[in-house]
């Protein structure tokens, strides 16, 4: 869509045209026409009632489209007394993103929809009108035009009523068709497309033919077209036209005119004796349809046919004949030189216009036998042998094709057994082969001989391996088969205890759910905006509760219990930079992408402009603390937009810190956030037990004591429900691995849960030390002994090695060599249990623990 600048609206003047009509009921004056005039232009634009106009909106690139229903002047308006009543159309980008899939297809480039919503405000100011457009109504079975150059032509096929797309009502369709017929300025886009499809080369040919007519033709009626040229006819003429060579161009209409005219100018064109071969192979149609270049007795037939064709076709159908420059010696040419476009993307060159005449044709026919007589006999023999070879290759390839298609077992006959008499008869009956360059002939012969040497096989060829397609579409890998279901009770429990599994209900948060639901519902019913701050430690169900509220509100909106709204969710963890939140909101709101600054400006215009928002928007901002910046402009805008009356924006923010507004926000930001706040307390052990039982309903995989143990353990530490679910899932894995009979696994006991809790709450360093070898554990004890002896938390490898040897002697173990101890030190350093200097220092490199000494002692203690 073209960019309609809204900055020029202030330099336009609007005035009424015609005498006013008084409305007796509403007591205001109505008009039938208005005019728009810009100060820097002298022209005026007149718009009448019933026309379609563009109206200034939020997006300057996509203004609103409407039909003028009434023009009137209302004295009760303070700012703009010139008013208009319109019938709105809606673009596809204005449809909510969550409902765009209801169309069921890809919308057209210039497609709009009849907006069937009586509650929408249709009273606008005349000063918001940008200009007039054309709207064409299409039947449901008509095809939407593609690639239109006129961006001010729109097409409508369906209507939109905020719920679904429907076909246009019959009365609306008839009304739009009547308006289309009344508009005389409307032109069908297909005609413009046909006109624009004409190639410039045909226009140049037309000018050349007209120039030749003015000089040589006596009758202009032969060259006048009686009907327009269609692209299909032009393509057919191109296929049957003469081959194009770089230097000479001739049109059949012009040549026929020159043949018919008795008083034509004499031109003597002499050709060289040796004709250079053409670069292209001539088609068979050219050899049979143009024998006049070789047979002088058929010149009259050519002249007669050209005369007939000139009466039927227009000069645009002029066929082009080009001859190579080295093959011509021009003695007398026309004084006028034209700029001839060369086809195929070559550079254009200035060449003289040459017209073939009967005299020239006779002279050429007379010279051809001389050239053939002067040619040596060896060339004729070579030409004959090449013709025979090509004929044999053709027969063999034809035989190979027939043998592949037929399944009958036939005996293979080589090409050498074909009789010479048959080849001579074929040579006499077939048309002469086109002249080619030696390189092209030898290349074709090599490729043909290579195919002829292949013996046909009765067994089918191997199927080719699938290759990467040329135009591959990137996509995510998908399964060919569905995922296998759970095979036992433990697998079923593991699936239900997953964090991503959606439970049937959300227990233990009924009060918080009701408070959030009432807040959002009141804003939707009042069509106003507001903010709510939700805080709580991780894993307390904040985001899950809000999702449940939105799901229930969407179901209520479908049942017409609450007004429809648009839901958008943004997570601060998924943003690379805080200002990218504008880009995400704009993309989910309108489906467009823009830079951060441009998106912020568009959103501010949408939420702060009067009458811009059509429905309420509910915005969920998760991880709000990650949107903090030095100027705090992002938080300020998110909390300031809902304060505007026209915004209809409800913002729900979620963070982990309860005192976040007072701790990191400025006063001007926290004051706009308001006092509507909610805190999610950590789960108690009874609530965690209820959550586990609700997920494990009808699945007996845990002992009652085990569930009670894990609920109390997690509630005492953090109250995180996600941590509780992860511990239970790990306990099911431990129970499944420890069971002797996989087919009949037992229940998850308290021992399994204690083991899972130890893994979950213990450090990975402690686990690594416990699972290390005896030599590695002895080396760690030597490090602790050296630290205790020196009083420092750093020692050289040589000092640690002395302590290591002493400990091995005390325990009666064979102490390792220096190299073995060096390898042990390097391995512990690779595991990041030690911080070791590079090995170039050898025994003097320093060693330091990467974990605390208490953790090492706890891991090395004997159980």
From Swiss-Prot:
The modification Phosphothreonine is found at residues 203, 340. Phosphorylated during mitosis. Residues 503-863 are annotated as: Necessary and sufficient for ORC complex assembly. The modification Phosphoserine is found at residues 199, 255, 258, 276, 290, 419. Mg(2+) binds at residues 622-623. Residues 419-428 have a biased composition (Acidic residues). InterPro entries: AAA+_ATPase, AAA_lid_10, ATPase_AAA_core, BAH_dom, BAH_sf, Cdc6_C, ORC1/CDC6, P-loop_NTPase. PANTHER family: CELL DIVISION CONTROL PROTEIN 6-RELATED (PTHR10763), ORIGIN RECOGNITION COMPLEX SUBUNIT 1 (PTHR10763:SF23). This is Origin recognition complex subunit 1.
